[in-house]
Amino acid sequence: MTARHPKLPHVYLKPGEFHFATKPTVVTTVLGSCVSVTMFDVFSRTAAICHALLPDGPRDDVFRYVDSSIIRMLEMFMSRGITPRQLQVKLFGGSDMLGATASRPGVGSRNVDIARQVLAAEGLEVAAADVGGTRGRKLFFYTHTGEVLLKRLNRTEADS
């Protein structure tokens, strides 16, 4: 899937990491119950993506948690004079792969819920999303266009 831009640098994003880009890059990550939020400013061609594991938690490891990841990403854009309303936001992941029920939602569902709540509280609309279900996802995020290519995985292929 990355053959479209074979000369661009590639980064593999692990759980609990993020990537902030001002230069064209292809960022790849694999999601199970984790979520990735992408943010892209079309004017400056600045982009960010996180791979958050849990809905919320202590602030010692910001990018492990959905809520603090989103806030920190926004702060990084705002520190460069980019306002939240300039951002195109996309949301991915949040599979419930380990037998969640309606009365006891899994961590994937909780990750998606928190992401949507924080984004709404910050006045951000989700332009595109592919969340939930029972299958993992592999993402290819093109930081110079904001485009995300997605491949759905069999349950055994997702590692988070």
Curated annotation (Swiss-Prot):
SUPFAM superfamilies: CNF1/YfiH-like putative cysteine hydrolases. It comes from the Bacteria. GO terms for molecular function: protein-glutamine glutaminase activity. Its EC number is 3.5.1.44. Keywords: Chemotaxis, Hydrolase. CDD domains: CheD (cd16352). One of its GO terms (biological process) is chemotaxis. Gene3D superfamilies: 3.30.1330.200. Pfam families: CheD (PF03975). Belongs to the CheD family. Probably deamidates glutamine residues to glutamate on methyl-accepting chemotaxis receptors (MCPs), playing an important role in chemotaxis. PANTHER family: CHEMORECEPTOR GLUTAMINE DEAMIDASE CHED-RELATED. This is Probable chemoreceptor glutamine deamidase CheD 2. The gene is cheD2.
